[in-house]
């Protein structure tokens, strides 16, 4: 990222402090859930370092693989092992559940009403002639991004939703 020197140095110091605090949180926090979230902070700061060094594909891979998969797996394992400790004061329905339900339902309804009204022609469908001409001018990581955002957009989103639902279901089963 081409930033002026002072802003770049400030971001480096800020991310360095985030790494140090996250690392200390992983080691010093007594609750393993908080330690796992601190590890997620460390992974996010590392990916932001990659963005500052103009390695955008590596940063995206860092976020998807480490934060999105490894850290979630660690949190799932910790919740599965310590399930009896957290389910002692289990309430069937709380205020937070109601607020979450209202927010999720309103988001779902807004998406259902917005998606059919959106013109997807310019977003998804691109001409093959332009792709053939541009393939020599772009790198492999840009081609991966173009294919994920054009040809494989809907399957990519469906897979991410299926994985999210499976993760939530696994956490719900582990907590009972």
UniProtKB/Swiss-Prot annotation:
A Pfam family that this protein carries is: Oxidored_q3
Query: What EC number(s) is this enzyme filed under?
Result: 7.1.1.-
Q: Where are the transmembrane segments?
A: 10-30, 32-52, 61-81, 92-112, 152-172
Q: What class of enzyme is it?
A: translocase
Topology within the bilayer: Multi-pass membrane protein
Q: Which InterPro entries does the record associate with it?
A: NAD(P)H-Q_Oxidoreduct_6, NADH_UbQ/plastoQ_OxRdtase_su6, Nuo/plastoQ_OxRdtase_6_NuoJ
Q: Which cysteines share a disulfide bond?
A: none
Query: Where would you find this protein in the cell?
Result: Plastid, Chloroplast thylakoid membrane
Q: Does the keyword Disulfide bond apply?
A: no
**UniProt entry keywords in alphabetical sequence:** Chloroplast, Membrane, NAD, NADP, Plastid, Plastoquinone, Quinone, Thylakoid, Translocase, Transmembrane, Transmembrane helix, Transport
Q: Which GO terms describe its cellular component?
A: chloroplast thylakoid membrane
Q: Which reaction does it catalyse?
A: a plastoquinone + NADH + (n+1) H(+)(in) = a plastoquinol + NAD(+) + n H(+)(out); a plastoquinone + NADPH + (n+1) H(+)(in) = a plastoquinol + NADP(+) + n H(+)(out)
Gene Ontology molecular function, alphabetical = NADH dehydrogenase (ubiquinone) activity; quinone binding
User: Is Cell membrane set as a keyword in this record?
Assistant: no
What does the record note on quaternary structure? NDH is composed of at least 16 different subunits, 5 of which are encoded in the nucleus.
- Which protein family is it in? Belongs to the complex I subunit 6 family.
What this chain does, per the record? NDH shuttles electrons from NAD(P)H:plastoquinone, via FMN and iron-sulfur (Fe-S) centers, to quinones in the photosynthetic chain and possibly in a chloroplast respiratory chain. The immediate electron acceptor for the enzyme in this species is believed to be plastoquinone. Couples the redox reaction to proton translocation, and thus conserves the redox energy in a proton gradient.
Q: What is the protein's given name?
A: NAD(P)H-quinone oxidoreductase subunit 6, chloroplastic
